[in-house]
Amino acid sequence: ELFWRDKKHVKNLDYWISYSFLDTKRDFLNFPTAITPNFAAKHTASLVVKKFVTKIKTNVNFSYNYASGRPYYNIQYDPNTSKTFFADQGRIPAYHNMSFSLNYLPAIGKQNAKMFPVYVLSISNVFNFKQVYGYNYSTNGMRKTELVPPSRMFIFIGAFISFGTDRTQEAINNNL
């Protein structure tokens, strides 16, 4: 695993880059042999950039996430041999997601503030990438359907308001 974060070289800019490599196999439950589980992506990476624009009291955030294609399997039972076998297998397409958010903090810097609102606009999967998480198979294994999110893109517009305790950093850091 690799991780790099920098908050010091550019004023009000925080960014990090991470990369993970995973090479694993398991002999588990009904697996015919030791195989890579369907939840294990060999390569994952992310890039996150957060910039606070003091003049307009706004935090601008971008994040990009990547995961290489994970394996999928349709493991069937053969009653004639009393063994399991691969009826279908392969790799799902690589996962890509670019997200963006704006956080407006009108109370930041105000003395004796009693209310701390954070107004948020957040868009996940800005480029509308098709994200396939796996496949479902019919009982007889003859048909497979993609497991996809109900919507390719998600837009959130909202406000987080705390009274008495300043939780603006919490709202910003948990938004990405």
Ranges and model annotations:
Residues 39-45, 94-98, 115-117, 151-155:
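Residues that define the transmembrane beta-barrel architecture of outer-membrane proteins
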